[in-house]
């Protein structure tokens, strides 16, 4: 079968289109003929060797796939699934506990871009204990998790503020119906948030950029505000000032989806709710770009440029 391999850590150029044996079946796993593959920033971190607990070269990257199960508990069904790695391939072994038949309302490309983004967004909002009419600010709002979080928060009655890095993405967010859109390139973007929020602060911030934005987050949160950190796209984890946390009784939560996947029961309950939203078309993954598997390096370059929106998909 055709795969993408990482034989040494490095930039997108280390992604090699090559041949590999089809995986042998194992108990508790289903072999899936892959129709579409979700590209995540975690894939880039694995490629560079910066993903916590990530694989050593040589390996096949890729965390989520959609396709037809040819063996396992879901044999014959179209499923989406999460794998430890190995998704950038024509066939993938998917744990039965992390494979979910998907409704006809989703295309294969949308299914491949569903699990990581929507589960991350779901757990982030659950950790934040989002309530109707609360003010939610999403950093990197045009990305996969950002768009998923906005769709879910809209169902929960939140007032949503989105931060994005370019005029083009800001316009796209406005056209998608986001209530408040602010460009992070604007020197006074914090003032813009304060103005649009009525000056009384933000209840919840979903943070995936890291670095200097952490200090801005703490300035924007109102007393008893909640900061949910699920990434550091800037490459700089940043620092939190305890004095700022104490001053306004702020709380900080960290979210790493991989750790939450250790509870299949919790994931199954979350997916029941998310898939019902999908059936009712209350949530729909936004596909920003589709590349052939052989062009995985170009997909990584686009993702790392931060010029993309929604989800990037590979097709075997």
Model feature map: region roles:
Residues 188-199:
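Short amphipathic alpha-helix with an adjacent loop that forms part of the alpha/beta core around
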Residues 265-316:
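C-terminal hydrophobic helical "lid"/dimerization subdomain
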Residues 21-39, 48-86:
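Glycine-rich beta-strand-centered segment in the early N-terminal region that forms part
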Residues 56, 78-140, 181:
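NAD(P)H dinucleotide-binding glycine-rich loop of Rossmann-like/cofactor-binding domains
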Residues 164, 212-282, 316:
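Glycine-rich phosphate-binding loop and adjacent beta-alpha segment
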Residues 114, 118-186:
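Mid-domain Rossmann-like dinucleotide-binding core that forms the NAD(H)/NADP(H) cofactor-binding site
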Residues 87-90, 165-172, 237-242:
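Short, glycine/polar-rich helix-capping loops at beta-to-alpha or helix-loop-helix junctions
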Residues 78, 135, 159, 225-226, ...:
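Short glycine-centered segments of the SAM/dcSAM-binding site in methyltransferase folds
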């Amino acid at each position: 079968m055709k795969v993408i391999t990482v034989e040494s850590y490095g930039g997108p150029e280390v992604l090699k289109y090559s041949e590999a044996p089809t995986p042998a079946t194992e108990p508790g796993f289903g072999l899936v003929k892959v129709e579409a593959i979700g590209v995540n920033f975690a894939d880039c971190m694995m490629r560079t060797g910066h993903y916590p607990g990530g694989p050593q070269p040589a390996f096949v990257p890729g965390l989520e796939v959609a396709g037809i199960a040819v063996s396992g508990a879901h044999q014959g069904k179209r499923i989406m699934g999460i794998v430890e790695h190995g998704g950038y391939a024509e066939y993938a072994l998917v744990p039965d506990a992390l494979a979910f038949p998907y409704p006809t309302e989703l295309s294969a490309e949308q299914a491949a871009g569903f699990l990581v983004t929507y589960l991350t967004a779901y757990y982030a909002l659950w950790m934040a204990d989002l309530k109707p009419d609360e003010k939610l600010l999403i950093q990197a709002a045009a990305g996969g998790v950002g768009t998923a979080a906005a769709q879910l928060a809209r169902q929960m009655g939140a007032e949503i503020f989105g931060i994005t890095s370019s005029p083009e993405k800001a316009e796209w967010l406005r056209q998608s119906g986001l209530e408040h859109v602010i460009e992070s390139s604007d020197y006074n973007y914090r003032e813009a948030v304060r103005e649009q929020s009525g000056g009384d602060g933000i209840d919840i911030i979903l943070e995936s950029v890291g670095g200097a934005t952490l200090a801005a987050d703490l300035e924007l949160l109102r007393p008893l505000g909640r900061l949910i950190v699920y990434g550091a796209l800037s490459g700089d984890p940043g620092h939190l000032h305890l004095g700022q946390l104490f001053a306004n009784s702020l709380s900080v939560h960290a979210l790493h989806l991989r750790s939450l996947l250790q509870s299949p029961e919790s994931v199954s309950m979350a997916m029941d709710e998310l898939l019902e939203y999908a059936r009712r078309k209350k949530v729909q993954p936004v596909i920003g770009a589709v590349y052939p598997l052989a062009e995985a390096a170009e997909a990584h370059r686009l993702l790392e440029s931060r010029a993309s929106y929604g989800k990037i998909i590979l097709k075997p």
